[in-house]
Amino acid sequence: GDANNTAWRLENMTVMAGGTNAETEREARRFGPYTFKSQDRLVTLEDYIAFGNRFYNSLGSTGKVTAITREGFSSANIIDLFVLEKATDIQLQKASPTYKKDLLNSIDEKKMLTDQVVVNDGLVRTLDLTITLRLDKEYKELEESIKRKVSTQILSFFAVDNMEFDKDFLKVELERKMFQLSEVRFATIDNIPDIVAVDHNEIIQLNNFSLDILYL
């Protein structure tokens, strides 16, 4: 049938952060078992990751942390932490010197004596997305409302609490989330490959997105 196109763009999103000590239910479910298992000592890489992701510094800042053991027999007890500090609910930033210092001091109290911990800057892999929504014509008068709903879904998907180091972006997962809205017939991301792979020290972050509407 005949199609009508409209475009909509949201750039440089800034979202107010939540309470500084408000650990999310998802964080508690994911990292709680590791903390319990470690008996308040940092023994395994999972312990370091759990501790780092639940850590708040002296200024109330939190962030995302991953840990790896440096390769090579002679350095088996060197733990490399990769850290990013939370700027907003959907944005990470390079961790401040204060944040790194506070994290390292807290770790020193709980780590094994034979472990040497090195704090490194994590890397943000930003995405710019061009998205096409296919809607039935009868929804044309509700276009702005639908765009707002879809935008909320997108921002929720990319919330810092949902992102992890070494977690690839799978296009189909976001398309599926947008498709959950009853008004959306189809949703496609048009400008990136099906999988955006990241390294162990990288984390995905949304930079901006545009919504194109195609009426069926």
PLM features: what roles do these ranges have?
Residues 1-50:
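Catalytic P-loop NTP-binding/switch module of NTPases
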Residues 2-7, 17-25, 122, 160, ...:
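Immediate N-terminus of the mature polypeptide
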Residues 13, 65, 187-192, 209:
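Generic beta-strand hydrophobic packing signal
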Residues 29, 36, 158, 162, ...:
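Preference for short coil/turn "hinge" residues that link or interrupt alpha-helices
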Residues 39-167, 174:
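Carbohydrate-recognition loop of C-type lectin domains
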Residues 41, 48, 174, 189, ...:
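Short capping/connector residues at structural and topological boundaries
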Residues 58-60, 73, 176-202:
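Short loop/turn elements at secondary-structure junctions
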